[in-house]
């Protein structure tokens, strides 16, 4: 009897021990990732994300919307707190020329121009403000080019050769960066599609699973949704445009990731086959940016 009781107690102790060793599921919240900028939208970091038994180092990997209106205070913050050493600009040439980046301190600037057909103003059409641009998108919500953007934007990013070349340049430069010299910052116009895809690829290279990649992408929706709910939409097509082009649409993004998996097996395989990021390069990135 005593021996049986002893065995039961031992099993209970083992069970309790196992339970206390379980890693709690990480809770990804927008407020925890924001980096304190007031003059740039969707400004956050990848730092703090748990990947297996390791985590991404804080204050090194920053992602934002355009920084063409960066305030003096925010520029100082990026210099003093984050020591930003390099800016990666994924906006198209026309976007960058019409609203040049405000470069914090002596940060190096690299243009990684990526534009979509009809997504940037290569014509004579100019918008005085974002409200005017939003109004135009909603007005032409049923136009084939606008609808194509809604359904195939991420396919263009992941599968078009010109887009892949842009992300090859991103990783090639990132591999030259020394974390001890400070953070890197990448952005596009809204910091959700081109910059968001860069974040997804980098997270995959660092060993993140689909759940974390999607959680990070969805933070853009969490950021923009409070703004878009104030904008009136009258049709389902307008709602689709609002959710995809002005906010962020995780469903459309994940559909592209599913296509990547179907064709290449995984996002990491895609990185190796299409972007040229070898397993050895991934190890370098993990050693630099994980702790």
Task: Cite the ranges covered by each PLM segment.
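Positively charged n-region of N-terminal signal peptides that target proteins for export
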Residues: 1-4
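Bacterial N-terminal signal peptides
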Residues: 6-15
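Cys-dependent protein tyrosine phosphatase-like superfamily
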Residues: 18-185, 197-291
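Ser/Thr-glycine-rich phosphate-binding loops at phosphate-binding pockets of nucleotides
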Residues: 190, 194-195
């Amino acid at each position: 009897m005593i021996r049986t009781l002893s065995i039961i107690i031992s099993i209970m102790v083992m069970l309790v021990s196992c339970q206390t060793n379980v890693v709690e599921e990480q809770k990804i919240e927008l407020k925890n990732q924001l980096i304190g900028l007031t003059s740039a939208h969707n400004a956050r970091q990848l730092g703090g994300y748990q990947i297996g038994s390791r985590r991404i180092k804080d204050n090194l990997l920053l992602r934002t919307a355009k920084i063409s209106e960066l305030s003096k205070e925010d520029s100082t913050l990026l210099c003093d707190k984050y020591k930003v050493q390099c800016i990666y600009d994924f906006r198209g040439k026309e976007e960058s020329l019409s609203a040049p980046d405000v470069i914090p301190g002596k940060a190096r600037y690299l243009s990684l121009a990526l534009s979509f057909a009809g997504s940037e103003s290569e014509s004579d059409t100019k918008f005085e403000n974002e409200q005017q641009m939003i109004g135009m998108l909603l007005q032409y919500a049923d136009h084939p080019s606008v609808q194509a953007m809604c359904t195939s934007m991420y396919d263009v990013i992941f599968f078009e050769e010109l887009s892949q070349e842009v992300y090859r340049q991103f990783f090639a430069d990132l591999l030259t960066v020394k974390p001890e010299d400070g953070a890197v910052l990448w952005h596009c116009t809204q910091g959700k599609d081109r910059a968001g895809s860069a974040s997804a690829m980098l997270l995959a290279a660092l060993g993140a699973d689909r759940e974390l990649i999607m959680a990070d992408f969805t933070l853009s929706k969490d950021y923009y949704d409070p703004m878009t709910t104030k904008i009136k939409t009258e049709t389902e097509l307008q709602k689709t445009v609002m959710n995809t082009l002005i906010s962020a649409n995780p469903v459309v993004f994940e559909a592209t990731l599913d296509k990547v998996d179907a064709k290449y097996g995984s996002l990491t395989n895609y990185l190796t086959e299409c972007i040229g990021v070898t397993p050895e390069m991934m190890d370098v990135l993990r050693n630099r940016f994980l702790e």
